[in-house]
Amino acid sequence: MKVTAAFASLLLTAFAAPAPEPVLVSRSAGINYVQNYNGNLGDFTYDESTGTFSMYWEDGVSSDFVVGLGWTTGSSKSITYSAQYSASSSSSYLAVYGWVNSPQAEYYIVEDYGDYNPCSSATSLGTVYSDGSTYQVCTDTRRTRPSITGTSTFTQYFSVRESTRTSGTVTIANHFNFWAQHGFGNSNFNYQVMAVEAWNGVGSASVTISS
């Protein structure tokens, strides 16, 4: 992302778009993927059979983690979730998160966040209205950074909900279709998860994915 000088060193690795560390699990309610990037930075637990996971980083973190549950292959299907999320003292997101293989892209639909809005330092693409709220939409180019293929240059897409929430249904197609007007491939998906990410501060989250 494009960041202010104050965040530059802090975010050096925060948005380094981790390569996945997949755990394939038995298929239940469609969930077949566990995202556990640097989950050892906190207390990460999950149960794929119930679609639940939790992450506690109450001792504080100073580098990036991304954890969650989802699918080995993403899609535009809607996701319904509920969460308890506390991250007011942390740079963190509660988001739908995933990758497109080609053209390579990393994406976030941010439902709630801590003390940092990613669109505050990225290129604005306008707004999109979905699921009862306006979302700020922005993009950035990450050059020679860690990705799902090792080190590469790729585009990030963000939709950030203005009326933040911790439960509801995310109509992913609305975001994909809007991003597609700005170069998003909208096909050839890699993994997709309901995720919690943080890279500093303290916080906690408990998430249930119901569809």
Swiss-Prot record:
E.C. code: 3.2.1.8
All residue ranges annotated as the GH11 domain in the record: 19-210
pH behavior: Optimum pH is 4.0.
UniProt entry keywords in alphabetical sequence: Carbohydrate metabolism, Glycosidase, Hydrolase, Polysaccharide degradation, Secreted, Signal, Xylan degradation
GO biological process terms, semicolon-separated: xylan catabolic process
GO CC list: extracellular region
Temperature dependence: Optimum temperature is 60 degrees Celsius.
Catalytic residues (positions): 106 (nucleophile), 197 (proton donor)
Pfam families: Glyco_hydro_11 (PF00457)
Compartment(s) of residence: Secreted
Signal peptide range: 1-16
Pathway in which the depicted protein is active: Glycan degradation; xylan degradation
Positions of disulphide bridges: none
Reactions performed catalytically: Endohydrolysis of (1->4)-beta-D-xylosidic linkages in xylans
GO molecular function, one term: endo-1,4-beta-xylanase activity
Gene3D superfamilies in alphabetical order: 2.60.120.180
Superkingdom field: Eukaryota
Record function comment: Endo-1,4-beta-xylanase involved in the hydrolysis of xylan, a major structural heterogeneous polysaccharide found in plant biomass representing the second most abundant polysaccharide in the biosphere, after cellulose.
Family, per entry: Belongs to the glycosyl hydrolase 11 (cellulase G) family.
Name the UniProt record assigns to this protein: Endo-1,4-beta-xylanase 5
Source organism per UniProt: Aspergillus niger
